[in-house]
Amino acid sequence: MKHLLLIALFAACGHQPQAVEPHPELTTRRAQMLGYLAEYTERGVFPTDERGLPLSVFEDAHGVRCPMAELIYRSGHPELVAAIVAEDNHARLGDIHDGPVHDWMVGSGLTHDEIVMIQGIADINYGPLFKIEQPANVITAQRERVRGRLETAQAALRKDQRDSLTAATLVLPQHRVPVVKVTRPAIAKH
């Protein structure tokens, strides 16, 4: 009996989990997302409130999209962005775990944590002092703060891409990239 236990123990220790290769479609989509994000950052036009300060919404009153809305839009899903804006313009993608928005996220080539990081870039706590009119230099400084956060996020996204792609591949349902079909509600939260 002792020998059987030792044999089972050695067999279990010798078992190597099979390495997961990143899904090729996710690799392509991730490269597209990083390209779109670089163009968005270079353009330097971010959602703002009525005073011109950066605002964390999917789309502002002038139709300017947040970084994640831009990625969804540029990837061929403007109807998904419109649905999110209509349902909850302040939606946090990290809270969405089902439905067409979730399907898009799973198939984007980005991990859940990366999506949360990108969307959180414009989350700036201005505090009570920012309830009054702000001079142009303060507005410019806050916009540059958003640009700096975007540049930092891009550097993080380029680092360890293989690990990120492997993580994104592991959450694919049945190793298949979901097809995004916009239904209502587009945002399904648990």
Model segments located where?
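Stable alpha-helical elements in mature extracytoplasmic
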Residues: R29, M33, V64-P67, H97, ...
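Sec-dependent N-terminal signal peptides
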Residues: H3-A11
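Second-shell loop/turn segments in exported
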Residues: V20-L26, L53-A61, M68, N89-R92, ...
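Short N-proximal segments of mature Sec-exported proteins
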Residues: L34-A82, A86-E87
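A cross-kingdom marker for long, charged
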Residues: D103-L110, V116-I118, V138-H190
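Glycine-rich short-loop/terminal segments
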Residues: Q18-G44
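Bacterial signal peptide processing site
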Residues: G14-H15
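A recognition module on extended beta-rich or small alphabeta surfaces enriched in W/G with H and D/E
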Residues: I96-Y126, I132
